[in-house]
Swiss-Prot record:
Its EC number is 2.7.1.89. InterPro entries: Aminoglycoside_PTrfase, Kinase-like_dom_sf, Thiamine_kinase. It holds the Pfam family APH. One of its GO terms (molecular function) is thiamine kinase activity. It catalyses: thiamine + ATP = thiamine phosphate + ADP + H(+). Belongs to the thiamine kinase family. It comes from Salmonella typhimurium (strain LT2 / SGSC1412 / ATCC 700720). GO terms for biological process: thiamine diphosphate biosynthetic process; thiamine metabolic process. Transmembrane segments: none annotated. Keywords: ATP-binding, Kinase, Nucleotide-binding, Transferase. Catalyzes the ATP-dependent phosphorylation of thiamine to thiamine phosphate. Is involved in thiamine salvage. This is Thiamine kinase. Pathway: Cofactor biosynthesis; thiamine diphosphate biosynthesis; thiamine phosphate from thiamine: step 1/1.
Length: 274
C-alpha cells in the first residue's frame, strides 16, 4: 500500500489516518532508529519507520521501501505501506543476537541475497565519503582525513568482481533468527554493488572471523577463495573510511557520545595501518 500524500505527517497522524486500530507498543531495539516504533493491534505488530536523516533526499527513503518491496520473504520483512516520510514493514518475530551467525549460515544468507535481481541503483562510495566530510563538524576535519579521502578518490573504486543487490549493514543486531530461518532487517543502505564490498563491510570481530566468512562464501558461490579475499582487501580502505565518516556524520546529527568514541577508535585503526 502506497499513499500519494506529499506532505510529511506526524506519527499520530499516520496512526489515526492509516492504522486507527493500532497503538504504539513497548519499545524494542529490533532494527529501529530515529523515531521509528512498533505499533500493535491485539497480537499483530508492525514496524513504523520514519525518514530520520535530514541530509538524505526523500528518494533514498523511497529506495528503502522499494528494496523491501522486491525482496522475497526468505530474506527480509515485507513492505506494507509508504507515504512521504514514513513506511510500515512487517515485524519479524524471532531472536536478535549481537553476535553474527556462524560463517556457513551467514554466507548462505548473503549468497541468497546476492542471487536476487538487482535493485536498479548502484552504491557509489566516493560521493558518500565526500558527503560525510562536508556534513561533519568542521572542527573534526583533519589533514589525515582529507589525505585519505583524496587518495581513495584518485585511485577510484575497485572494479567489481560480481554485481549483485547488497544490504551493506550486516551485523548481529540486523539479523533475526525466525522460525523459518535467518532474515535481514534495516535495509536503508541497500543498493547494487560488488559482492566483495558487502563481505568487506560485514561487522566482524577480527580477521580470523572475516576469513572464515570469505572462505565459506567462496565455497558456496564457487569463487576462488584467494581471488575473493584479495577483492575484499581492495575494498577494505573504503569500508574503514565509510565507517569513520558515518560515525562522524551521526555524531554531528545526534550529539551522542557513542558515535564520537567509535569515530576516534576507527581513526586510530586507520593511522596504525598507515
Amino acid at each position: 500500500m502506497r499513499s500519494n500524500n506529499n506532505n510529511p505527517l506526524t506519527r499520530d497522524e499516520i496512526l489515526s489516518r492509516y492504522f486507527p486500530q493500532y497503538r504504539p507498543a513497548v519499545a524494542t531495539s529490533q532494527g529501529l532508529s530515529g523515531g521509528s516504533c512498533i505499533i500493535a493491534h491485539d497480537t499483530h505488530r508492525v514496524v513504523l519507520r520514519r525518514h530520520h536523516d535530514p541530509d538524505a533526499p526523500p528518494a533514498h527513503f523511497l529506495r528503502h521501501y522499494r528494496a523491501l518491496s522486491q525482496l522475497p520473504a526468505s530474506l527480509a520483512p515485507r513492505a506494507l505501506f509508504y507515504t512521504p516520510g514514513w513506511m510500515a514493514v512487517e515485524y519479524l518475530h524471532g531472536v536478535v543476537n549481537s553476535a553474527l551467525p556462524d560463517a556457513d549460515e551467514l554466507a548462505a544468507l548473503l549468497y541468497h541475497l546476492h542471487q536476487q535481481p538487482r535493485f536498479g541503483w548502484r552504491i557509489a562510495l566516493s560521493p558518500l565519503l565526500a558527503q560525510y566530510w562536508s556534513c561533519c563538524d568542521p572542527a573534526r576535519r583533519t589533514p589525515f582525513w582529507l589525505r585519505r579521502l583524496k587518495q581513495l578518490q584518485k585511485n577510484g573504486e575497485p572494479r567489481p568482481l560480481r554485481l549483485a543487490p547488497l544490504h551493506m549493514d550486516v551485523h548481529g543486531d540486523n539479523i533475526v533468527l525466525t522460525s523459518a530461518g535467518l532474515r535481514l532487517i534495516d535495509w536503508e543502505y541497500a543498493g547494487d554493488g560488488d559482492i566483495a564490498l558487502e563481505l568487506a563491510a560485514v561487522w566482524v570481530e577480527d580477521e580470523r572471523q572475516h576469513r572464515q566468512l570469505a572462505d565459506a562464501y567462496a565455497a558456496r558461490a564457487r569463487i576462488d577463495a584467494r581471488q575473493l579475499w584479495r577483492q575484499i582487501r581492495l575494498w577494505h580502505p573504503w569500508v574503514i573510511m565509510l565507517k569513520a565518516g558515518w560515525f562522524e556524520y551521526r555524531w554531528r546529527q545526534t550529539g551522542e557520545q557513542q558515535f564520537i568514541r567509535l569515530a576516534d577508535e576507527t581513526w586510530r585503526q586507520l593511522r596504525m595501518k598507515g
